[in-house]
Amino acid sequence: MKSFTKPALGAAVVLALAPLAAAAGDALTIYSSAQPGAIRPEQYRNGVSGPAVPGYAVVRHLRMLELKPGRNTVRFTDVAALIDPTTVSFESLTDPKGTSVVEQNFQFDLVSAQKLLEKYVDREIEVDQVRGSGVETFRGTLLSTSGGLVLRRADGGVQLLPHNAGVRLPELPGGLITRPTLVWDVAAARGGRHEARVSYQTGGITWWADYNLAYAEGTNANACKLDVGAWVSILNQSGAGYTDAKLKLVAGDVQRARPPGYAAGGLPAARMALEEKVAGFEQKAFFEYHLYTLGRPTTLPDRSTKQIELFPVARGVPCEKKLVYYGLAPGWRNVQPNPITDRNYGVQTNKKVDVYLSFQNAQANRLGMPLPAGRVRVSKRDDADGTLEFIGEDTIDHTPKDEKVLIKLGSAFDVVGERRQLAFSVDTSRRTMSEEIEVRLRNHKDEPVTVEVKENLYRWVNWKIVEQTHDYRKEDARTVVFPLRVPAGGEQVLRYTVRYTW
């Protein structure tokens, strides 16, 4: 039998077998996935395996059990299959000082057809094999189960049989269990009824936030409003279900040690009125993270996904729509350790103009609460029939209150860009180079648009724009942004010259 064992404190005789009684209460603290939106719907719908789920939880069980004075064996089968046995804790709340764990085992040698056969290697079995319209029975000693059944008959001959043959075993061998089981050797100073708490970490369970945004046009082409709703999505593939459990969620990047090579404030009055009817999540700061506690018990069946409302819909949140043109093709945006003097480096163009939405996570905007990392889906109402149509999605990281949320929706259909190099020169003796860039934006809409042209000055860290046709602002050490107004059905042209020195 496979087991995880803590060293015993001394030899003793087991006096009693004390199975744990029915649950008095379960509690889970689930830690947010480091990869919001990393699990696609088709993955968990088709049964993504528990070890592939990028999250974990701390599970706590309260159980009532009968102990005798002295040594007791306690078995606990209501345990997650993906438990980390090194994190298991057993504690008697009735007599914590007089009750101690001498030895702890995690048994996971689960019964299966293959395991049963392996237990009968070098033992005699009977195998029924269909032969035409009849059945032939073979008796012999099982030598191997690899690639089929290998039997040594009484006459010394060897019989090879397929795995799907009908095997008859005289009895169920010992040492096999139907569910993962924790077994404790408990020393109790006091006998009688004890309330015990069992806790452990398990994989195969995670949570993330799903935000549903309804977009509406504002007073101009860039202004807009959003209705922001948020739900918590919980995926449980841990190998255990949790009934009427107390639920807490932790948002934040909590550090965990991994083996090498491992892959894996107050509420507005309108909201309070709703929460009096159905208890929702209460949020508070917790260490350097945020803790969300559900005000009611909930049930999380194994191999299931559950959604719970994180907060009621915040309506009419002011937002801004931006068109951003990043003309440098994606493959050429990396920073290099030396000046890039190759004139053909980065001249490839990207024609797509990206569409972004941004809003401030502020109380004045009917938000102002920590937003956990998750997926953001945006829809817009079709005035013809009143239905909401999907217009894009993105993921966001953990976002504190009063910070800006930026969402990329996709690329504009009617606005295109083109970037090209007009001139380039290098003077290696003076350690200088000069490059002239032209950006053309074409607007096929019936209304003017504003496009932010983002230019990455990627050739070297020391740069100066010596000529330009439009004003710009510096976004960071190597990026500038030119806001351009493009007329309806027209074109706007930007030219600038940058000089690098090293």
Q: Could you say what each language-model-derived stretch is?
A:
Residues 2-5, 15, 20-502:
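Long, intrinsically disordered, low-complexity accessory segments associated with secretion
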Residues 9-12:
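GHKL/Bergerat-fold ATPase module in large chromosome/replication-associated machines
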